[in-house]
C-alpha cells in the first residue's frame, strides 16, 4: 500500500504537545468541579456535570479509565447492571443483554469506553497519570476549596516534589474503596468532623440501594460517590454489580449542580 504521510519534525511534535497541554492545565486550574477517580461513579458524575454546563475536571492516577470496570468479575469480562441504572447505560449507547426482568449483563470494555466517551463528549476533561494527595481548605465558612496534585510517576519514584493546586467549588471523591481524598481531609482537617467507619463485607441486595441513598456531601465542598460512599458511611460492598456506581455518579452530579446554583443565587 502506498500512502503519502505528512512529515512532522520532532521539535514541532514537542512544541504542539507542550503548548496544548499547558493550555488545558491553565484553563482547568480553576474549575467548577474536580472529580478524583475515573471509575464508573466518577465518569458518570463527569458526564452529568459537564452536561449541566459545569467546568468539570477528572484526575485519574492510572494511564487508563474505568476503575473497577475493566477487571470485570474476577477478570471475567462481563458485569451486572440492574434497573433503573440501565437507563444511564442506554443514554450512552451501551448494549445490554437482559438475563431476567430488570437485570442485565454488559461487556466491561464497552461499558467503560462508552461511559468515558460520553463524559468527554459532554465537555469533561480527563487527565491521566495524576494523583490527588491533599485538598485545599478555607475558613469562615470552613470548606474544601480544591486539591493538590502530583504526577503519579513522581510519587511512585518517592521523589520529594511539591504539588500544584487546582481550585474547585466542589471536589468529588470517586477513588473507590479507600475514599482516599476524604480520608486525607478527615485526618488533616479534623475540624471538618468527618468520621470514617470503614466499609463492611458483602451484602449486595442492600448495598446497591444504600450506596445511592448515602451519596453526596460529606463536608462543605467535599462529596463522596461510588465505593467511597461505602467506606465513609460504613456500608456493605456489593461486588461486580455496577448499577449503584453509575446511579451514585448521577446523584452526586445532581446534588452538586443544585448546591452551586444556590451558591450563585446567594452571591
UniProtKB/Swiss-Prot annotation:
Record's subunit section: Homooctamer; tetramer of dimers.
Binding annotation for NAD(+): 41, 60-61, 68, 132, 160-162, 227
Gene: thi4
Domain of life: Archaea
UniProt: Fe cation binding residues: 162, 177
Role description: Involved in the biosynthesis of the thiazole moiety of thiamine. Catalyzes the conversion of NAD and glycine to adenosine diphosphate 5-(2-hydroxyethyl)-4-methylthiazole-2-carboxylate (ADT), an adenylated thiazole intermediate, using free sulfide as a source of sulfur.
Protein name as catalogued: Thiamine thiazole synthase
Coiled-coil boundaries: none
Top-level EC class as recorded in UniProt: transferase
Keyword Transport: no
Keyword tags: Iron, Metal-binding, NAD, Thiamine biosynthesis, Transferase
UniProt pathway: Cofactor biosynthesis; thiamine diphosphate biosynthesis
Biological processes annotated in GO: thiamine biosynthetic process; thiamine diphosphate biosynthetic process; thiazole biosynthetic process
Catalytic activities: hydrogen sulfide + glycine + NAD(+) = ADP-5-ethyl-4-methylthiazole-2-carboxylate + nicotinamide + 3 H2O + H(+)
Organism name: Saccharolobus islandicus (strain M.14.25 / Kamchatka #1)
Amino acid at each position: 500500500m502506498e500512502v503519502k504521510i505528512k512529515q512532522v519534525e520532532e521539535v514541532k511534535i514537542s512544541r504542539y504537545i507542550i503548548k496544548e497541554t499547558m493550555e488545558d492545565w491553565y484553563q482547568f486550574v480553576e474549575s467548577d468541579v474536580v472529580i478524583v477517580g475515573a471509575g464508573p461513579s466518577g465518569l458518570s458524575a463527569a458526564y452529568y456535570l459537564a452536561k449541566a454546563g459545569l467546568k468539570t475536571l477528572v484526575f485519574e492516577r492510572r494511564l487508563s479509565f474505568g476503575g473497577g470496570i475493566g477487571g470485570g468479575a474476577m477478570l471475567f469480562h462481563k458485569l451486572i447492571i440492574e434497573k433503573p441504572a440501565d437507563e444511564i447505560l442506554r443514554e450512552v449507547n451501551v448494549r445490554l443483554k437482559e438475563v431476567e426482568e430488570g437485570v442485565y449483563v454488559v461487556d466491561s470494555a464497552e461499558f467503560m469506553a462508552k461511559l468515558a466517551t460520553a463524559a468527554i463528549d459532554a465537555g469533561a476533561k480527563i487527565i491521566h497519570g495524576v494523583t490527588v494527595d491533599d485538598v485545599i481548605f478555607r475558613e469562615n465558612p470552613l470548606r474544601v476549596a480544591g486539591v493538590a496534585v502530583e504526577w503519579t510517576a513522581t510519587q511512585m519514584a518517592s521523589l520529594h516534589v511539591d504539588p500544584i493546586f487546582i481550585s474547585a467549588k466542589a471536589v468529588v471523591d470517586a477513588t473507590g474503596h479507600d475514599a482516599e481524598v476524604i480520608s486525607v481531609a478527615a485526618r488533616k482537617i479534623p475540624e471538618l468532623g468527618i468520621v470514617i467507619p470503614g466499609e463492611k463485607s458483602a451484602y449486595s441486595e442492600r448495598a446497591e440501594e444504600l450506596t445511592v441513598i448515602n451519596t453526596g456531601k460529606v463536608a462543605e465542598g467535599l462529596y463522596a460517590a461510588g465505593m467511597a460512599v461505602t467506606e465513609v458511611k460504613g456500608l456493605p460492598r456489593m461486588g461486580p454489580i455496577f448499577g449503584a456506581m453509575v446511579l451514585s455518579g448521577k446523584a452526586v452530579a445532581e446534588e452538586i449542580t443544585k448546591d452551586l446554583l444556590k451558591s450563585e443565587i446567594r452571591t
